[in-house]
Regions:
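Short, conserved beta-strand edge motifs with alternating hydrophobic and charged residues
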Residues: 30, 164, 197-199, 221-225
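Generic long, charged, amphipathic alpha-helical segments
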Residues: 221-236
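Thiamine diphosphate
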Residues: 1-164, 169
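Glycine-/acidic-rich phosphate or pyrophosphate-binding loops and their flanking alpha/beta elements
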Residues: 8-20, 42-44, 149-160, 169-215
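Conserved strand-to-helix beginnings and helix N-cap segments that scaffold or border functional pockets
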Residues: 89-90, 206-207, 233
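Adenylate-forming
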Residues: 29, 213, 234-235
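Secondary-structure transition/capping motifs at alpha-helix termini
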Residues: 49-50, 214-219
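Single conserved hydrophobic/aromatic residue that forms the stacking wall/gate
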Residues: 235-245
Length: 245
């Protein structure tokens, strides 16, 4: 049996920016002294004149990105989720969300999976914060394949997008035939007894949980909701039945 390939979604983020950068000269990347960790350093190496390190000043970085977008550029502003959504929330809200500017925020090291980085860096509030901003699209891809497509979808979307990536390498369960769409859920596994809804790295965990439940005679359905906003309520309701938990 072949070993499951594992890749961190932040790796996909950086590599896809380079891919897009080759086709779209208006794409620029901003960082806050974390290019090596957020994996945007590969973009800096390929396009040094289109990468801007704003230093440890995330709030200012968001305002710079906002200004760039008004001049026709498509900025991807990147930092850890704790800083992109937490420290810079006011600037994201007022300078990007309120005027509905075409800025993409790439937030890495999200959730508690950053482990040894400590509680101060374990951002679990970013979903709530970013969803509260009118017009902000919020996406949390589950694996390398979905992350690459999500970055491309964010570029093609006219408006603010918050992309959430993890630090850890996670199993790649999508194949090249998978097509990501903003606002659309995905039925990963069919099941008739219980439904498990997840996103990000928890989708792979949900798949493994479904296997464990199967050993106990429980047929679990797994749904991936990568788009947190706008969420696919239609997709979720389609799987509601009196028999399902």
């Amino acid at each position: 049996m072949s070993e499951v390939k594992k890749i961190a979604t932040r790796e996909a983020f950086g590599e896809t920016l380079v891919e897009l950068g080759k086709k779209h000269p208006e794409l620029v990347v901003l960082d806050a002294d974390l290019a090596a960790a957020t994996k945007t350093a590969v973009f800096k190496k390929s396009f040094p004149d289109r990468h801007f390190d704003c230093g440890i000043a995330e709030a200012n970085m968001m305002c710079v990105a906002a200004g760039m977008s008004t001049m026709g550029l498509v900025p991807f502003a990147s930092s850890f989720a704790m800083f992109a959504a937490g420290r810079a929330f006011e600037q994201v809200r007022n300078s990007i969300g309120y005027p509905h500017l075409n800025v993409k925020i790439g937030a890495t090291h999200a959730g508690i999976s950053v482990g040894e980085d400590g509680a101060s860096h374990q951002c679990c509030e970013d979903f709530a914060l970013m969803r509260s901003i009118p017009g902000m699209v919020v996406i949390c891809p589950a694996d390398d394949v979905e992350a690459r497509q999500a970055v491309k979808a964010a570029y093609n979307y006219e408006g603010p997008v918050y992309l959430r990536f993890g630090r850890l390498a996670v199993p790649v369960f999508h194949d090249d035939n998978y097509k990501f769409e903003i606002g659309k859920g995905e039925l990963v596994k069919e099941g008739k007894d219980v439904t498990i809804i997840a996103n990000g790295l928890m989708v792979a965990e949900a798949i493994e949980s479904a296997k464990t439940l199967a050993e106990q005679g429980i047929d679990a359905e797994v749904i991936n909701i990568a788009t947190i906003k706008p969420v696919s309520y239609t997709h979720l309701r389609a799987h509601e039945t009196p028999e399902h938990l």
